[in-house]
Amino acid sequence: MKYDLIISGEIGVKYDWWTGRQGTTADMVRSFLTKNEGKEVNIAVSSPGGSVADGLEIYQAIKDHGKCNMYIIGMTASAATFLCMGAKSVNMVVAPHVG
């Protein structure tokens, strides 16, 4: 499966200087969806969660776009779970960890 966007790392954090990991912010997702307005997109999610505020913004952006298919590909918890609820479809690979 080819994913157009992967939501990973901590939600609401662009870059975690402590761990050196990149996260995903609402601005990043909105920018991607704006560039792909009117197109059907496949978005993968593997995130421990994070900011509720950013998660809600991402949820709304995905819902407003209307053509997002979400794929849970790894651990998806907390804020990363409810942002998927705005999608056209939500799919899980074999043995994902949703919490």
Enumerate the predicted regions with their spans.
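Terminal-region recognition feature
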Residues: 1-99
